[in-house]
Every structure is written in C-alpha cells, then in structure tokens.
Regions:
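Aromatic-lined carbohydrate-binding/catalytic grooves of carbohydrate-active enzymes
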Residues: 1-91, 96-120
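Short acidic, glycine/proline-enriched helix-loop-strand junctions
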Residues: 109-142
Length: 200
C-alpha cells in the first residue's frame, strides 16, 4: 500500500502507525518521494538538511535560469545538499518501517544545465546517473519504483512506470496505447512493469 504525495504532512509517529496498520493487514507499506525537484520554487528558502545552503544554490540552471518542468524546479543531483536530503529522507523512511518507495519526476535529475556542482559531470544523464548511485547508497535495500524517469540507466530500480496518469479522454487512451508499444520490452530491462493504474 503506497502513501503518495502529501505524506510529509504526517508526523513520524503517524507514519509508523500507517506502516504498522499495513503490516497488520498483511501488506507492504510504501511511500513517495521526488528527490530531484523543488515544488515550492522558492530560491531563498533554506535547506534544513544542510544549513548554509538555499535552494537557489542547488538548482540546475540553463542560460542562467532555473530549469523548470511540470511545475517544479530541477535540482542538481551532484550537490552535497541533495545528498544530505537523501540521507535524511532515507533515515526517516527506514525508521518508519517503509519497504517500498516510488521515486517520481525523476527526469528532473537528467535535465541539461550550464554546469553541475561536480565539475566532472558534463551531461544531464551523467548527473542523473550520479544521483541514482546516491539513491542506491541510501535506498538500495528498499523496493524502488521509478516514475517519469529516463528508461536508462535501469540498474537502480526494480520497476518503472511505463507511462504517466491517464484519464477518460480519447487522448489519454491514445497516450496509454502508445506507452504500451514500448512497454512490452521493458520487462526485459526491469524486473517488473508498472502500468500505473487500470480503469475497471
């Protein structure tokens, strides 16, 4: 059972209670996170996990402007403040007892930029791979499901969503069928395909 976006409005005790309820029902407790995004888009906001840094210090910039996609700013996967956030979030998830995490909006971590904190990184996919290695370091003992993510590199997760949300319009049906056209071969890349949701 996955606790989606909004889980951070709960206290640690409430998160633990959710996990305990799932276990009592014979279910595995899952949670959600977007490690490479800033939804607040507030450059002056301080990063609580690494005092001394503000969000403007970790954004990916292109032509001097923060990279924005789907309503969120992209952050630099190579910045030490992002690793500090990963460590902090991982520790919370582990203390609460979560065994599964859906990592969403992962494409933000693969966006191109003028530069990265780590000067050895020259492309968006290199930055993404660097960030995924860090995620593996902190979340590697959990079941990882990627969403809105590059197909490759694929070795850091057990599953990937073949597409995003689809609703009741014909364009959504077209979108879902298009996703299926490449979804069939992803079973050879990831252990499991995630179709997101199915209308019954």
């Amino acid at each position: 059972t996955g606790l989606d976006s909004g889980w951070n409005s709960f206290s640690e005790e409430e998160l633990k209670a959710f996990v305990d309820k799932c276990k009592a029902n014979g279910q595995v407790a899952g949670v959600y996170w977007t490690p490479f995004t800033d939804w607040a888009k507030n450059p002056e906001r301080e990063i609580k996990e690494m005092p001394g840094y503000k969000y403007k210090d970790v954004y990916l910039y292109a032509n001097g402007k923060p990279q924005e996609l789907d309503g969120a700013y992209a952050v630099d996967p190579t910045h030490p403040a992002i690793e500090a956030m990963m460590k902090h979030t991982s520790e919370l998830f582990h203390r609460a007892g979560f065994e599964y995490v859906k990592m969403d909006f992962m494409t933000h971590g693969a966006m191109e930029a003028d530069k990265w904190y780590n000067p050895e990184i020259q492309t968006g996919i290199q930055g993404y791979n660097y960030g995924m290695q860090l995620l593996d370091k902190y979340f590697g003992d959990m079941y990882i499901n990627l969403s809105i993510s590059p197909v490759f590199p694929a070795q850091y997760a057990q599953s990937r969503r073949i597409a995003c949300d689809a609703w009741n319009k014909i364009k959504d049906t077209e979108y879902t069928l298009n996703a299926l056209s490449y979804g069939w071969w992803q079973k050879y890349i990831y252990q499991f395909n995630d179709a997101d949701h199915i209308v019954l």
